[in-house]
Amino acid sequence: MDYDPAHAMSRGGSMRQTISRSVSKASRNMEDIFNTSSRRTKSVNEDEEALKWASIEKLPTYNRLRTSLMPELGEDDVYGNQILNKAVDVTKLDGEERQKFIDMVFKVAEQDNERILTKLRNRIDRVGIQLPTVEVRYDHLTVKADCYTGDRSLPSLLNAVRNMGEAALGMIGIRLAKKAQLTILKDVSGIVKPSRMTLLLGPPSSGKTTLLLALAGKLDKSLDVSGEVTYNGYRLNEFVPIKTSAYISQNDLHVGIMTVKETLDFSARCQGVGTRYDLLNELARREKDAGIFPEADVDLFMKASAAQGVKSSLITDYTLKILGLDICKDTIVGDDMMRGISGGQKKRVTTGEMIVGPTKTLFMDEISTGLDSSTTFQIVKCLQQIVHLTEATVLISLLQPAPETFDLFDDIILLSEGQIVYQGPRDHILEFFESFGFKCPERKGTADFLQEVTSKKDQEQYWVDPNRPYRYIPVSEFASSFKKFHVGSKLSNELSVPYDKSKSHKAALMFDKYSIKKTELLKSCWDKEWMLMKRNSFFYVFKTVQIIIIAAITSTLYLRTEMHTRNEIDANIYVGSLLFAMIVNMFNGLAEMAMTIQRLPVFYKQRDLLFHPPWTYTLPTFLLGIPISIFESTAWMVVTYYSIGYAPDAERFFKQFLIIFLIQQMAAGIFRFIASTCRTMTIANTGGVLVLLVVFLTGGFLLPRSEIPVWWRWAYWISPLSYAFNAITVNELFAPRWMNKMSGNSTTRLGTSVLNIWDVFDDKNWYWIGVGGLLGFTVIFNGFFTLALTYLDPLGKAQAILPKEEDEEAKGKAGSNKETEMESVSAKKGMVLPFTPLAMSFDDVKYFVDMPAEMREQGVQETRLQLLKGVTSAFRPGVLTALMGVSGAGKTTLMDVLAGRKTGGYIEGDVRVSGFPKKQETFARISGYCEQTDIHSPQVTVRESLIFSAFLRLAKEVSKEDKLMFVDQVMELVELVDLRDAIVGLPGVTGLSTEQRKRLTIAVELVANPSIIFMDEPTSGLDARAAAIVMRAVRNTVDTGRTVVCTIHQPSIDIFEAFDELLLMKRGGHVIYSGPLGRNSHKVVEYFESFPGVPKIPEKYNPATWMLEASSLAAELKLGVDFAELYKASALCQRNKALVQELSVPPQGATDLYFATQFSQNTWGQFKSCLWKQWWTYWRSPDYNLVRFIFTLATSLMIGSVFWQIGGKRSNVQDLTMVIGAIYAAVVFVGINNCSTVQPMVAVERTVFYREKAAGMYSAIPYAISQVTCELPYVLIQTTYYSLIIYSMVGFEWKASKFLWFIFINYFSFLYWTYYGMMTVSLTPNQQVASIFASAFYGIFNLFSGFFIPRPKIPKWWVWYYWICPVAWTIYGLITSQYGDVETPIALLGGAPGLTVKQYIKDQYGFESDYMGPVAGVLVGFTVFFAFIFAFCIKTLNFQSR
């Protein structure tokens, strides 16, 4: 092996090593406690040690491979340095023992990792074992994708309809639209070699992710792929590439309520130990033959890492340590709803999840996003040691590798525009570009140079050849020249000789789909699901409480003292209560749908990584739902059975309990199946309600079996509710109290007569047939759930969008003038729209929050925690200030406090703007704030986002033409012109890339023409070239005379030195430097070097990295100083105080900022702009509007065809009950669908609203009214075609007044349902809670709708709720408008001739035709009320916590 473990660290790492060595010196007094600790100890313990090893050698192989020596500190360790080793079973080590071992072996991760791996390698080499290696080759690999271009790529309603039509025609072979073909990778070839660290570099959209996916065998099936990828000569279809290699995604998908350690443990259990156990077995055999005893630490490490079937493995603790996650291992990962670990830590969990497995071929996609450079260096250093010492094959793409990290790599692959510009040793890459005439500047990182030198905009600045004029060298020229370059020709020669398959180690590739036995995988999944169930206990308690509350309401509504058993009418009330019990317990499963969908992204990731087969996930889910269901069913039965007064018979109680339990199980199964088929919340809400509609309509209770049209009768036999309804009614009505009485016509038993009225089979055996049916459906639906998870893929992949192609010739000409054009733009900026340059000064700023509960529990006495400690400084016009510090220093906190963005906490201190005290109302008008998270409306284009911001934030006096011109100039400034028509999209799902979103965030603030701009980490998550583009935009902004402050994480040299001044903070909210950077950062460097003991900055070292290391906590401990105190005592601090004093006095003749209004536009102007944006958002949300329209169409056709021409039947009560059933079903199902589909829409837009409101764009009321207004035309279209279809198919009387009433009542009913959904979102912190809150009232709305129990039968203590139930008024209006004037006689139950229809609906339901005016008024009132509450809550409730 050509790697030397003592390989000298790069110049970049030397500084860090100096500090880490000095910090760990104290802990290394008993250096290497496992090795012979001292001569004295050696002589004492040698024999004992040998005896212990000898006793282990005698054990049977199975036991020997589980037993090792565990170091144990003796009583006199501190004084006598005595180490005792005890024999332990590695599979039975508890968490504390494992942690103790890891802490002893890996004191300083990057140094000790190398030490232990070197020992491990030496042990393997000593007995001559060859490690399996994998060489990955790709030959002439080309990847193409079909995509729409220009306007056709926008997801509008029209395009969605066209796409659906084309897809349908495509199935029969007709192709209409020609899609453009986008080449992602263009004929690339190369080799990724084992035991060499390979770095993948390239600007955004160069195809890095596609290359990594192609090599890992995970490319999307829809892509057009040619060429081949081989592992050790084997094609991808000859083994299982997903188990042989691991692709580490740039998207962090994890279960939010699992802790970091649990996440890694589950991954380790699913991936197994691979060949580690076989290697250990062979190693132990050879050592035994050679009479060699291993070293205790390596032996324990290897045996514990190879231990199979353990719940928590040592390899997890090791991975946590080398990734620096050991500090947060017991913290939950968190998600949008729950605070967990930081973004950088989440990124490391994604990495850890894969490297915890046995796979040694890793393709890692942007693993450093959100990490500071020292953490990235540490992780890459540990990976380098793994690669060099265990001969792993690793290809890593990094965004902004610091020079010291870049130097850890052996090989570089440089990709640009889908072509390979260079692949080979790192040492020759600069030589390659120098051969063209490009040179990397002195103070520039090589990685940054490489990403910019192929870019048209950046190339010229690196041209150094004085003998030739510069010309743009395109990527294709670089790629073809590389093939002739000595590195390229050597690579071609290697590729021309095929890999000899016979040399491939038998353990190198995986040929089995799963790593461990299916029973073990089932056990792992069971443990995980059980844990998640316990964590989700609040959710289950909430569901049970909800069931108990509805049960209590039901039992007081149908109270036994009010219930009788005299005749059919009494029996019908009982049947109504049973029917309601069925429906409530059916809908109780609805929450299962939201939970399943929430878990799907993580499930798909783990399924595609072959962690476990889908059935090992679905089986525990189903089985663990049973006890919860038993508990909920028991709660329902105990509360309702005897209080309602069902048959007083224990057997019938348990029989009804069984039916309720099976309904819950069947419902959970059907909702899981719907969730797994629909895969998104909007479609699932719609699809789910459609399936339920079929089940309800054909269940035999809204429409008796014999009345169901012939064409729908088949559905009766496959509707689970028909079996449930038969069983539950037969159980009750066969009780003696019903069968011992005669019916009204005295020919049949009362119970039988009622069963005949409902068309239920009057046979006792139908109870057990019903039970069998429900049981069968439960199994079938859970089976379908498993099949759907097995074969369906996630929806909503990022779509490729090509903006309208521009004239190539114009493009060519524009290229060379770009820089001068940029300069002219920046010069004009201040002139086109004038602004007042403003300075900001702040003196002794402090910020407190209430002491967190966890800290109080640990005994902290203070009531407040101080996050900022007396910060004093100033920001000035035309000066670009960097706000820096380690994580937790308070950078973002200070910026939020100064910008007035904090929603809680206590602020002290003096903040002034150009000498006047800061007033937040006026400050919001003259300042901009670019948040770290790029929050934008997903359905508008880039240009529309900017127009919206400009029209709302620029002064009224600015003309429309000037505003539009300004928008175009800002797009030019931040280089967004090519993307002006691109849809923004959702982060990580569709639309713009991270870097494009970042530039849009800056542009949205710039179009407001602010004087002061705050930017929170504008370059985090960007590659070097993108960061350079963003910083160029920032610099251009400052040069117009604005005041700009940026928090910045770990900048490269050129980004750092683009700043003029620096405000440096340390952990705890203290300032340790505030002042100018100086040329080449000399002022900062001189300031810190002036303190005794601070090491000098190494040559060409990044001053930002040096400064953070030199002032770190570790450095303070070593030097015994506090840099905050040193700063306070410095002359620099005094100068700053003087500057702040000077800026705290207004200039001569200056007046305080004053605006006559809080917002730049009046309320009408705000409303118009908000409506404009909402209109486009709605138009481009086909997953909301088109799905809603399709659902309504399907519902109306279904109801129309089931209740075909039933509206004209009025001869008896059963006919009228069927019509009321049809109207009830239609109102409830379309209403609930409107309510649930609008929720995600409002939730997404509310997040954007918080940002825009904080920016002072508009007031909450115009925003809320615009969203309410947008619904009006869509609901009108929905109502019109719905009413036409239902009215004609059900066969109501064609009379203009009746039809218009029908449309009017339905329109306002659908509107109030929609606004009710919007209101629930505005009342709750997130969409999930809104969904649960809304569904809590569905049951109550149903119960009091007048369908299950008519108003005259409702007890007087509940009748008030009938009057405030919107659904009751809808049914009142619809029935009365159609039948309130009908004088035809109607036959009552039992066949007796009786009243007119008009009289019957008045007596039975309390509906009177004279009250149609008030009904209309009340329906309009509900609509206005829900809309008003929505607007009021949006205005007053803020669920954002900062």
Curated annotation (Swiss-Prot):
Q: Which UniProt keywords apply?
A: ATP-binding, Membrane, Nucleotide-binding, Repeat, Transmembrane, Transmembrane helix, Transport
Pfam families, from UniProt? ABC2_membrane, ABC2_membrane_7, ABC_tran, ABC_trans_N, PDR_assoc
Q: Which GO terms describe its cellular component?
A: plasma membrane
Give the binding site residues for ATP 2.
G885, V886, S887, G888, A889, G890, K891, T892
What induces the gene encoding this protein?
Induced by cycloheximide (CHX) and cold/dark treatment.
ABC transmembrane type-2 domain span: 520-733, 1165-1379
Q: Which domain of life is it from?
A: Eukaryota
Q: Name one GO molecular function term.
A: ATP binding
Which stretches are transmembrane?
538-558, 573-593, 619-639, 657-677, 683-703, 714-734, 769-789, 1186-1206, 1218-1238, 1272-1292, 1299-1319, 1329-1349, 1357-1377, 1414-1434
For membrane topology, the record states: Multi-pass membrane protein
Q: Where in the cell?
A: Membrane
The entry's note on the tissues where this protein occurs is: Ubiquitous with higher levels in roots.
Summarize where ATP 1 binds, as residue positions: G202, P203, P204, S205, S206, G207, K208, T209
Q: Which residues form the ABC transporter domain?
A: 169-442, 840-1092
Q: Mostly located where?
A: membrane
Role of this protein: May be a general defense protein.
Give the UniProt family note: Belongs to the ABC transporter superfamily. ABCG family. PDR (TC 3.A.1.205) subfamily.
Q: Which PANTHER family match?
A: ABC TRANSPORTER G FAMILY MEMBER 39-LIKE, PLEIOTROPIC DRUG RESISTANCE PROTEIN 1-LIKE ISOFORM X1
Tell me the protein's name: ABC transporter G family member 35
> What is this organism's lineage?
Eukaryota, Viridiplantae, Streptophyta, Embryophyta, Tracheophyta
